[in-house]
């Protein structure tokens, strides 16, 4: 049989043209449907959002004040019956959640508990200046008791003075450290306040590095029990110098000399809590006439870490009140709060991508792709009471237009305890999707019809 090349080419081109027109109609139809679907999805999302806003507003209007709401969340009927401290907090150091609070947001003087901030800033400074020394100024040498007894003109290594600061609570050492790092007490106070803001403290104002009662144009030297617990959490859990901080504050005895080796000094740790309970981790005492007795301390047991902060916990002769309150709160936490595994790696619904291009299915204008939770663990351990439950809320977009990148944000998975958000993960796309174009579609169609197999079939059977 005689072959007719021109006939073959003509027929193939005709088939391509018909197929292309058919696919174009199919694409236009699907595109219109996807556009309507996307518009409906967007509208539904807006309605849902407005509804959520109205509900949130109702809840806000129904709350008389933040303090009352905070207290209401934490009433279980078995809280510590009586505390001597006027302000107190029990915090989960892992999450930063306040497990119990008594006037936790009332602003009060903090006395020498201030020195945990002075210490952690000094340790972070020493990371770059490990052998920094300081010449004692007249201001440092004239600080009232409790003091090391340094003299003007003496030179000390800052790292040695941190033991004087934290074990004996020496006021002159605090001023010397501040001047050695920032040049003056005033400049160091700025660094203290900046760090407090960075940590998330909302009601803390530092004026002195040693915690002596003071007042300036910004207010009095003060904090809250919750803010003080946040600062301790930073010192033992978050700071890059947390291990060194624990090493310093747990040291029982320390001896050092001035840089010229003319005098020798000995320091003894006065934090009685370290020997009071198994797992006692760190802490700092404080007292001034305005502040009363204060304390902030931490305990770690069975992988749980608790922080207690106490302000205005008695005045002379009630020095032991702070230890009773600390023990009572720590025992309360140990008895009632335990880690529970909460499933986190929840896979949300798939995401519809319109204007999508799949080389394997060129006539398809949309496709569904999987979503995943970014950097998610299999499960998350959260410190909870037996009766507490975690509520999960998934918010994802229903539709996106191509192109879509792999790992592109598509929503969030939030975890709530009562009405408080305690964790949030980002939901991202599982893979990339190309944008559909006419050129890409026609290229695929042409390639399919111009294969050698199709030509052979046509010649053989037509």
Placement of each model-derived feature along the sequence:
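Gram-positive cell-envelope targeting signals
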Residues: 1-46, 51, 446-462
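Structural motif marking the loop-to-transmembrane transition
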Residues: 5-9, 158, 438
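Intrinsically disordered, low-complexity segments enriched in small/polar residues
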Residues: 18-20, 43, 50, 60, ...
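Compositionally biased non-globular segments, especially hydrophobic aliphatic-rich helices
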Residues: 22, 27, 41-47, 59, ...
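Domain-terminus/edge residues, biased toward the C-terminal soluble/receptor-binding domains
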Residues: 27, 219-462
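Active-site-adjacent loops and short helices of periplasmic peptidoglycan-processing enzymes
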Residues: 31-240
């Amino acid at each position: 049989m005689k072959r007719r090349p021109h006939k073959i080419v003509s027929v193939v081109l005709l088939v391509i043209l018909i197929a292309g027109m058919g696919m174009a109609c199919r694409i236009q139809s699907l595109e219109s449907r996807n556009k309507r679907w996307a518009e409906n999805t967007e509208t539904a999302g807006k309605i849902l959002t407005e509804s959520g806003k109205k509900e949130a507003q109702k809840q806000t209007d129904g709350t008389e004040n933040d303090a009352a709401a905070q207290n209401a969340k934490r009433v279980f009927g078995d809280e510590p019956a009586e505390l001597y401290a006027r302000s107190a907090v029990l915090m989960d150091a892992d999450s930063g959640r306040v497990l119990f609070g008594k006037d936790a947001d009332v602003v009060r003087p903090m006395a020498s508990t201030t020195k945990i901030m002075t210490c952690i800033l000094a340790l972070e400074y020493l990371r770059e200046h490990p052998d920094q020394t300081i010449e004692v100024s007249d201001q440092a040498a004239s600080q009232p008791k409790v003091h090391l007894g340094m003299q003007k003109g003496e030179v000390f290594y800052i790292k040695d003075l941190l033991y004087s600061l934290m074990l004996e609570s020496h006021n002159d050492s605090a001023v010397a450290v501040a001047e050695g790092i920032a040049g003056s007490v005033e400049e160091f106070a700025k660094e203290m306040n900046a760090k407090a803001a960075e940590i998330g403290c909302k009601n803390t104002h530092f004026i002195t590095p040693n915690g002596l009662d003071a007042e300036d144009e910004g207010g009095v030297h003060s904090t809250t029990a919750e803010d003080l617990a946040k600062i301790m959490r930073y010192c033992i859990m978050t700071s890059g110098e947390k291990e060194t901080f624990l090493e310093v504050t747990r040291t029982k005895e320390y001896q050092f000399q001035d840089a010229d080796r003319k005098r020798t000094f000995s320091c003894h740790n006065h934090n009685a809590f370290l020997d009071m309970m198994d797992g006692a981790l760190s802490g700092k005492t404080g007292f001034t006439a305005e502040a009363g007795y204060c304390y902030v301390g931490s305990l770690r047991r069975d992988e749980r870490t608790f922080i207690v902060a106490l302000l205005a916990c008695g005045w002379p002769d009630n020095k032991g009140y702070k230890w009773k309150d600390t023990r009572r709160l720590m025992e309360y936490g140990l008895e009632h709060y335990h880690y529970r595994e909460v499933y986190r790696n929840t896979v949300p619904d798939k995401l519809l991508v319109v204007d999508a291009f799949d080389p394997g299915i060129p006539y398809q204008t949309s496709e569904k792709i999987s979503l995943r939770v970014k950097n998610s663990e299999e499960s998350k351990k959260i410190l909870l009471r037996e009766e507490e439950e975690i509520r999960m809320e998934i918010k994802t977009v229903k539709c996106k237009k191509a192109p879509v990148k792999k790992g592109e944000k598509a929503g969030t998975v939030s975890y709530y305890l009562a009405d408080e958000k305690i964790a949030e993960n980002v939901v991202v796309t599982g893979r990339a999707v190309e944008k559909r174009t006419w050129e890409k579609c026609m290229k695929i169609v042409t390639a399919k019809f111009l294969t050698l197999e199709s030509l052979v079939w046509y010649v053989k059977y037509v």
